[in-house]
Amino acid sequence: MLLELSEEHKEHLAFLPQVDSAVVAEFGRIAVEFLRRGANPKIYEGAARKLNVSSDTVQHGVEGLTYLLTESSKLMISELDFQDSVFVLGFSEELNKLLLQLYLDNRKEIRTILSELAPSLPSYHNLEWRLDVQLASRSLRQQIKPAVTIKLHLNQNGDHNTKVLQTDPATLLHLVQQLEQALEEMKTNHCRRVVRNIK
């Protein structure tokens, strides 16, 4: 699977052939630090002074390299596919090898960082439900609508919490139909490809 880069990312990476290979390696280290701790403008300014370029140019170069490494790591691109993806950029063979080495050295760490950054969503534990219907009343003249009360038990990071929801049967039926439609859509080839690429 080849990584497709937008024109903007190609422009950001176009700065790399203009600098020494040691600088590109340092940019790779800064890119991994960027993932761990976030952006640090002082590092960009210091590198920009040494290279006699604007700090925006350095920042764009690091961000382009960060995108290249994170997307490649996220998709678990093979060595050959990574080389083919970078070859399109028109870099020298030495720079392509250096980028490949950066990718191979850091892909496990980048995947670990990305998994830590992913939001922790609650997961289903148990469900209780009750149908509430008023059987008789002298004062009500309109039709009585039943209500479905749902008690949803969830787990999140080892903590158990409970959500109580109430709805009418028509809305619940519509919700069930939408969920069944979504599950059917997950069986399509397009969705399978998307899910495979997310992992």
Swiss-Prot record:
Q: Does the keyword Transcription apply?
A: yes
Tissue expression notes: Ubiquitous.
> Superkingdom of this entry's organism?
Eukaryota
Question: Which InterPro entries does the record match to this protein?
Answer: COMM, Commd2
Q: Which UniProt keywords apply?
A: Cytoplasm, Transcription, Transcription regulation, Ubl conjugation pathway
Where is this chain's protein located in or outside the cell? Cytoplasm
An annotated GO cellular component of this protein is: cytoplasm
Q: Does the keyword Disulfide bond apply?
A: no
Domain named COMM: residues = 123-190
Q: What does this protein do?
A: Scaffold protein in the commander complex that is essential for endosomal recycling of transmembrane cargos; the commander complex is composed of the CCC subcomplex and the retriever subcomplex. May modulate activity of cullin-RING E3 ubiquitin ligase (CRL) complexes. May down-regulate activation of NF-kappa-B.
Family listed = Belongs to the COMM domain-containing protein 2 family.
Whom does it interact with, and what assembly results? Component of the commander complex consisting of the CCC subcomplex and the retriever subcomplex. Component of the CCC (COMMD/CCDC22/CCDC93) subcomplex consisting of COMMD1, COMMD2, COMMD3, COMMD4, COMMD5, COMMD6, COMMD7, COMMD8, COMMD9, COMMD10, CCDC22 and CCDC93; within the complex forms a heterodimer with COMMD3. Interacts with RELA, RELB, NFKB1/p105, NFKB2/p100. Interacts with CCDC22, CCDC93, SCNN1B, CUL3, CUL4B, CUL5, CUL7.
Q: What is this protein called?
A: COMM domain-containing protein 2
| Naturally occurring in which organism (per UniProt) | Homo sapiens
Kindly list the organism's lineage: Eukaryota, Metazoa, Chordata, Craniata, Vertebrata
Gene designation per UniProt: COMMD2
